[in-house]
Curated annotation (Swiss-Prot):
Keyword flag tRNA-binding: no
Keyword line: Membrane, Mitochondrion, Transmembrane, Transmembrane helix
Transmembrane segments: 20-38
Induction (record text): Abundant in stationary phase (G0) cells. mRNA levels rapidly decrease upon exit from G0.
Protein name per the record: Stationary phase gene 1 protein
Location within or outside the cell: Mitochondrion membrane
CC annotations in GO: endoplasmic reticulum; mitochondrial membrane; mitochondrion
Source organism (scientific name): Saccharomyces cerevisiae (strain ATCC 204508 / S288c) (Baker's yeast)
Membrane topology qualifier: Single-pass membrane protein
Amino acid sequence: MKLDSGIYSEAQRVVRTPKFRYIMLGLVGAAVVPTAYMRRGYTVPAHSLDNINGVDTTKASVMGTEQRAAMTKGKSLQEMMDDDEVTYLMFSSIM
C-alpha cells in the first residue's frame, strides 16, 4: 500500500503553519519546563554542608530504619500520599 504524496505534503504544510508552532511552544512552556524544574527540586533537595557533614552513613544506621513500600494493597493514592505529592504526580503525568 502506497501513501499518497498529497498526504505527506499536507502534513508538512500543517506543521509549518504558525498555529501549530504556537501550540507546541505552549505545550513545552506550560507542561514540560515546569515539570522538569519540579522534578529536579523533588528528587535532588537542597542540602547545606552542615547537614551533610552530620549524616551517619554506616550500614548499622541504615539497617535500623524502616522500609517503605511504594504501593500497598487496599489503599488509595490519596491515603498513601499527601496532597502535594498527588498534585505533583498528576502534573508530571502530562509528560
